[in-house]
Amino acid sequence: MPDWLLTLLITVVKAVAVILALLTTFAYMTLVERKLLGRFQIRVGPNRVGPMGLLQPAADAIKSIFKEDLQVTLADKLVYTLAPIIAIGMALTAFGGIPAGPEGSLFGENPWVYNLDAGVLALLALTSMGVYGIFLGGWASGSKYPMLGGLRSSAQMISYELGMGLSILGLLMLVGSTRFTDIVLWQGANGWMILFQSLGFALFLISSFAETNRTPFDLVEAEQELVAGYLTEYSAIKWALFQMAEYVNMITASALMSTLFFGGWRGPGFLNGIIPGIADIPILWLVVKIGFFLFVFIWVRATLPRLRYDQLMRFGWKLLLPLALFNTMLVAGYIAFFSSWGWWPLALLSLLGLTALLALSDTVRQLWNAPMTRRETELPPVPTRSAGGD
């Protein structure tokens, strides 16, 4: 067999394995989320299908596949059908660039589907392209509420993609590479990036909630305002594909935070002194870290209320973006003037930046609780007709 064909075959097998793992995780993430939300709200959660409700994801999948697929008369049928495929396709493709271990650690093969020189930039580009599926789905539905949800998704992505990119710019300046494997190896030699970029991590975490359209930034499908946003006119398997894309994006965002700030596949080194070799099991530690951040996503959903749309935009442009620029300037100043002092000045500067963010809590609260704009508060009253007629 030619080498190129063998390489292609191995890549296809790894891609299929990643897709199956993501879809299985998505299925049981829905169950875990409903169970945890039930605990948070002092109720039981799904417990009827199978032992302890463990077969609920299978029941949901069968229901989605065999439900009637309704379609609005005015919908653009081609785009309406392609939109969920684009959303899930971008989500699945993005995760393939996350390394699950060092080179050659997967039965002699590399534990990733692709490892580009510009891996971080490529993954951010792929995750941001998922918004095309949401916008096109809203536009092609032929209804006003999905269209509003699609427009919100575009504005939200533009606002928070800038903050997300700038929040990791300092990290990339320190490492000097955009390859995920180089970033993990750098952390193995110098310590987890969270020690030196705590402010950058806080900003990236907030941006991740907005990028994945999760509470408190789930404005694109706000039930109280837009019925279900871009999902209003979708049903059956097309609706399930959009839900699948959302959860896969959550998994990808969790893997990104684990890789960029928490050492990726590496476990805490001090554990080797307790149980020899326990910190050197690559895939195990990546899965544990991803699971932790998925719990954070669910925890925040159960805790925080949804923002208003004007609060969402104000928070992104007036607070998140300036702080991300400030963090980048801190790292640039460290590299220019203090790099010969070691890593402790950078850790101190990052901690001071995070303290400044906490010190701005009053400003954050003002942005959060700001009144609506003048135009919104001074809308003319809606004329009414008397019930008795003329």
Swiss-Prot record:
UniProt family annotation: Belongs to the complex I subunit 1 family.
Physiological role: NDH-1 shuttles electrons from NADH, via FMN and iron-sulfur (Fe-S) centers, to quinones in the respiratory chain. The immediate electron acceptor for the enzyme in this species is believed to be ubiquinone. Couples the redox reaction to proton translocation (for every two electrons transferred, four hydrogen ions are translocated across the cytoplasmic membrane), and thus conserves the redox energy in a proton gradient. This subunit may bind ubiquinone.
Catalytic activity: a quinone + NADH + 5 H(+)(in) = a quinol + NAD(+) + 4 H(+)(out)
HAMAP family: NDH1_NuoH
Record-linked Pfam families: NADHdh
GO molecular function: NADH dehydrogenase activity; oxidoreductase activity, acting on NAD(P)H, quinone or similar compound as acceptor; quinone binding
Spans traversing the lipid bilayer: 4-24, 78-98, 120-140, 157-177, 191-211, 247-266, 278-298, 315-337, 341-360
The protein's enzyme class: translocase
Localization terms from the record: Cell membrane
Keyword list, A-Z: Cell membrane, Membrane, NAD, Quinone, Translocase, Transmembrane, Transmembrane helix, Ubiquinone
Annotated GO CC locations: plasma membrane
Name of the protein this chain belongs to: NADH-quinone oxidoreductase subunit H
